[in-house]
Each structure stands twice: as C-alpha cells, then as structure tokens.
Amino acid sequence: MSRKKRYINNGKTIKEMLNLVVKKFPGEPAFKRKEQGKIRKISFFELLTEVRNLGTALYEDGLGKERVAIIGENSYPWFQVFLSIVCGGGVAVPLDKGFTATELRSCLERSGAKAIFCDKKHEPLVQEALALKEEGKEALDIKVYKMTGEEERLSEMKKIGEQAILNGSTAFYDAQMEADDMAVILFTSGTTSMSKAVMLSHRNIMSNITDMQHYERFYVSDVNMAFLPLHHSFGLVGVLVFMASAACSVFCDGLKYISKNLAEYGVTVFVGVPLLVENMYKKIWQKIRKDGMEGKVNFGLSLTKIPGFRSVWMRRKVFSKIIEGMGGHLRLIICGAAPLLKETAKGLNDFGIETIQGYGLTETSPVIAAECPEDLAAGSVGRPMPSMQVVIEDKDENGIGEIVAKGPNVMLGYLNQPEETAAVIQD
C-alpha cells in the first residue's frame, strides 16, 4: 500500500469511528502484538469482533452502560476493554497505575465505577484498595476482572459474549450514544492536593482527532508506538487518532526495549515526552562520536543547507545509517507535555526525522496547538487546531499572559465539582 494513502475519519462518536474504519479497511492491521515470541497482526475486523464480544459480555453482566475503571500496563487487552466500554455506551475510567491504594480507592469512589479491569501486576493494588475500611463509609461494591495472567477473564468473557450474540443478543450492537454523551473520565495529576476528574465526551475526543488528521500527515501505512501511559489523555488519544486514520499501533515492551521495538515492529511514528526524545537524540550523537563519524555527519549537515538537499527524502538518504539505527522506518516524532530543547528538535529534523511539538491539557482532549511538517519552528508549539479559538489574555510587557481556548474539544466539566468547572469554563 502506498505510503501516502490517508484516511480522514468523520465519525462523531468513538463507536462510529471504529465502524467506519472497519467498513473501509477491514483487513488492515489495527494492532501488532507479540504472542509466544512471534508478532501477530490484529486486523480492524478482528478488533471489532473481539470488542463486540467483550462489550456484549459486559451487557450480560449488567455493565453495558455503566462506568467501568481500567488499570494496568499499556497493552492490547487494555485497549480492547476500553473500546468495549465506550462503544457500548458506557464510560471508561482509566486509572494511574502509580496510585497508592488510598488514591485508587478515592478515584473509584469519586468516579462511581461499578467494575474495574486490572492486569496481573496491579491486582494486589486493586484488592488492597477495595479492602480499605474508612469510618462512616460503606464498602465498595465493585466487580473485579483480570485482563492478564492466570485466571484472566477476557477470553471467557469474549466466549460468553459470542454465544450471547449467536443466541440473538443485539444489546451492544444496538447501543446508541450521542456525540455529547460522556465517554471518559480522566483524573488529572494536578497541582492541587486532590486530582480533578475530567469528563470528556465523544465529541470532545473525536473533534480533536479530526483536527489532528487534517492538520498533520498520518498515513494508513503508519505504525505508531504507544509508549505514553493510556490513563493520560495524550497517550489515549494518541492511539485513537491512529486508529481513526486506519493506521496500526503497537505497545512498547519497556524503556530499555524501545530501540528493539522500533525495528521489529517497523515503527514509523513515535509519540513521547521531551526527556525521552532528548535522550534518544543524545544516544544518536554518542554513537556518532564512538564510531568516529562526527566529521562525516557534520559534512552531511552542511549539505542539507543546500537547496537541492533540503527535502526530507534527501536528508533521510544522506543520514540513512542514523535512520537505520532508529529502526529503519521512523519518520515522525510527536512531542508534548513539556518544552523540547530546540537543539533536539532541529537536530532530529536535520536528520530527516520530522519532529513536532504540541501543547494542550487533559481538559482540551488534549491538543490545543501543534506544529505540522509544513510549518516547523524549533521551540514553538505551532498553531491552534483548526476548530479552536485561542487568545492570550492579561498580557504583560513581554506578551506573556493566560491562554484562553474555545472549541468542541473543551471538556464537559469536572465531575461533581460545579464551582471548579464554573471557574474555568465561562462560555
């Protein structure tokens, strides 16, 4: 398939988005994952089938339109669960795997979750949180489902859902939702003593995805490495935007396996935070110096200033060995959450790996502004997304002030905190 093939998804809800992709690209890989040492491709059709089976099982368990929490490492089972919740009309509550038992219990109580899915590693934390007893509070009546490890429930649940569908159940298939219905509750890591529960609708998320699809260049042939935590809006929407674009996502095996995973999965897009991206760039130069190639690389960099050598294609040709060291296919790095060093952004772009920055927050689902490959400026976060209006209020003599943003990606509000919501949403 041509590298340049793009797909703009017009879905108004996450369920509609997934159905549209499956209808047009049923056989394209939605995910790749390792199974028994081999890489397996999961097509969009297979993904939807598994999501429908699991979502139907949730209806069979009385959880079809409830709030359901998820905690665990980034994984394909994690995302299956997420999609089965939100595409069935429920609300997903992704939770930070770094929570203490007390923090986890608090978020479960505040969110109103009726069940929680956890992986094997975090089951002890979940059980500890549920066992906590606080004076004057009732015990939490929450169902616990294991996603991975011994006694994992997903395989059994998918069989239950499949049989229910064969028996005539259409509960999940028929589940209706409006664009303004809540889809996700995300807890901010926050600067206050208690994190806020941000309510995001299908419209919030899908409008941001559509903006990014029009503004950036995502291709059907792309392979996105999902490294950022899925309980963060940047990590979660970072996978959803590639799914909406009919591209593939993979999950990193861990920090020390990034280089290996980039190569074996054929990763073309990496979404990360500055510290990680800067470390990747430092390692490139460490290897250049170790191999005694500094002079040749500097000569190559001088060539890229000549008009005939400025194209991305030519830069990648000149620095093909560096590209090979980054897995051989990496073409785009998207960075957010904090400022990226100008030297790093410029350096990676000079090597032919387009590196862009964005700015946003959980409350805006999350992107407010971003660079695009046609409009790069090291040190900048680019321009506002197409559907956003952004102004700087109360500017000082240096032009620094408060960023005020308006658009369809602005949250529904903070859960059960009307005063806090009113303080930040004025229109």
Q: How would you name each of these model-derived features?
A:
Residues 30-62, 66-75, 79-83, 100-109, ...:
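Conserved AMP-binding/adenylate-forming core of the ANL superfamily
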Residues 270, 314-427:
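Conserved AMP-binding/adenylate-forming
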